[in-house]
Every structure is written in C-alpha cells, then in structure tokens.
Amino acid sequence: MEVDIQSKKILLKEKVDQIIFWIKKKVLSAKKNGVIFGLSGGLDSAVIAALCQKAFPDNTMALILPCESTNDDINDAMSIVKKYHLSYKNIDLTPIYHQLLSIMDTTFNNRMAKANIKPRLRMIALYYFASIFGYLVVGTGNKSEISVGYFTKYGDGGVDILPLGNILKSEVIEIAQFLEIPQNIISKPPSGGLWENQTDEEEMGFSYKQLDNFLKNGEITDKKTEKLILTMSQSSVHKRNRPPAFKFKK
C-alpha cells in the first residue's frame, strides 16, 4: 500500500512538472512577461493559482472578481492568495453588473442571459490587466466541463491558454490534493457562481463522476444520462471551435 501511495505521488509530481513547463513554454513563446487568472475560491482556480505561482513566482497575478458572490467564496480565494503569496487585486464587479442590467432591455427576464454577463465582465477585467502587464490570461476550465460546453462563451471561455483543458475533473482533484489545496476548497460543491446556491452538477443534470466515466469509457450504464451528455456535447460544439468563416466557391 505504501509503495502504491509513493508511486502515485511520483506520477502526480511528474504531471505537475509537465504542466508547469508547458505554462512557461506558452508564455515565453508568446513573448509575454507572465500570467494572470481569475481566482474564484473554487477548486480549479486554486489549482491554477498553485501551478502559475510555481511557473512564474514573480510574474503571476490573481484577480478576485466577485459579482454577487458569497463571502465564503471570497474568503476561500483570499486563503489561496495567502497560501501561495500571490500578487492580487480584489475588484467587486457587482455595481457595474447591476448598472449594466439597468440600461439593458430587461423585459425578457432571462436568468441565464443575465448570469452569463458575470463571467464576461470578468473576462474584460482579466484582459485589461493582461494588456497592462504583458501577461497571458490563463483559463481554469477542465476537460470535463469543456467537453459538454459548461462554460460561458467569451466569458470564462475567453482565455489564452488552458493548462487543465485536457485533464478530467477527477484528475484535477488528485492534482489539488498533491498540491495541498485546502480540503474545504477541494470538497465544496463545484459552482460557476452564476446565481445563489447554483451548482455545476445540479445545472448539468449529472455528476462529474458520471461525466468522467463517460469520457474515459465512451459509455455509461445510465443511458438517460449518457444521452444528456451527448446532447450537451453536440449542442456546444460552436463553443469549442473558432467561428466558421464563409468561403467563395472556386
């Protein structure tokens, strides 16, 4: 048992080292100075914080961008800032979010349309500071959520690089444990923070465990869930691809 645990730690260290090297390579090849990312207080952004700090100890910036966010999420984000000694800015986007809604046509009252403004405002803030400091914007999305389009187009999907983009949620959890991310952050229900008490799994209609099993094996025993996963994946292809461009026939 001890040998298995030690072997797993060695494997995880190799994975972490590969990701850190990849981040460095992407930033240097883009001729940028460092990295910037949004720190929500969730698991994925905590892992990204740890990886980025290891890649660029002196040129990493975290943006805490609450927008109707809970105090717990803000406190969790701050705990990561302190743990990894991150350079950061805490900018409350709630007032500008409400101001924007007040001048829009709100007669439709579409909750999702309103909620998606939040990650898009965060994207604007990230690229503003990225431009000032010459940093790349690092996304926090993982393979599981990307595969079913569980992200906001031109919001949290609007980034320069995705270190976790080919890593399943279950694998991100293992990396988080190896990096000694606080257990309360690892165990809290994943949430995009789009509205009060919103969780990823409730909104998707299935668990990350089911989704990861499907992505690993190509099928799961629960065919209703399998169909839902396939439907979400197919309907979100446009979110994962560049916009199609018209071509004249030759």
Stretches found by the model and what they are:
Residues 120, 124:
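Catalytic-core regions of hydrolytic enzymes
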Residues 45:
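Catalytic nucleophile loop
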Residues 49, 74-75:
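Conserved strand-to-helix beginnings and helix N-cap segments that scaffold or border functional pockets
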Residues 1-35, 51-54, 58-61, 68-69, ...:
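ATP/NTP-dependent adenylation/nucleotidyl-transfer catalytic domains that generate, transfer
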Residues 42:
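Conserved G/P- and acidic residue-centered "switch" motifs that form tight phosphate/ATP-binding loops
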